[in-house]
């Protein structure tokens, strides 16, 4: 993958990710799960920018298709092209306000597959992310406003402990 052509985004917005219609092949599922687990570690530890793509693919671990493998390879190509990105923290002595943390939350309303919204939030301190989360909401929100409130509630619970 060192000489792979880099891409600008981990997921192609024009491709719809769908379940595999072909029965499961155990060897394929095992290698897919291994690579996906390694990418989940990277997403959780240092690269929150791939969290959505990795979480989306995790839903197909039991029966991955060649398309799902192709998307995993695309994420690797994205990582290869963005090696310079990472989390950095900076000390701001002159302006104490810069050392405070900031939080951002958002929601994506009603996934086409199961109508559940997705919550995402990130908290930043000294210029770097200190905690973040991306997860499917457990309820089916009836409006975008409701899904945003759920996202803010999740972020608020996390902020309470920071």
Cite the ranges covered by each PLM segment.
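Long, low-complexity, charge-biased intrinsically disordered regions
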Residues: 1-162
């Amino acid at each position: 993958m060192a000489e792979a052509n880099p891409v600008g985004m981990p997921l192609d917005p024009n491709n719809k990710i769908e379940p595999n219609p072909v029965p499961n092949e155990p060897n394929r599922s095992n290698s897919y799960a291994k690579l996906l687990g390694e990418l989940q570690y990277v997403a959780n530890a240092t690269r929150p920018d791939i969290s959505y793509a990795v979480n989306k693919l995790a839903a197909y671990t039991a029966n991955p298709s060649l398309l799902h493998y192709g998307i995993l390879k695309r994420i690797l190509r994205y990582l290869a092209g963005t090696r310079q990105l990472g989390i950095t923290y900076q000390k701001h002595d002159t302006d104490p306000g810069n050392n405070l943390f900031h939080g951002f939350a958002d929601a994506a309303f009603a996934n086409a597959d199961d109508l559940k919204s997705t919550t995402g939030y990130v908290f930043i301190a000294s210029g770097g992310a200190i905690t973040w989360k991306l997860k499917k909401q457990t309820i089916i929100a009836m409006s975008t406003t409701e899904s945003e409130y759920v996202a803010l509630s999740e972020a608020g619970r996390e902020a309470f402990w920071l």
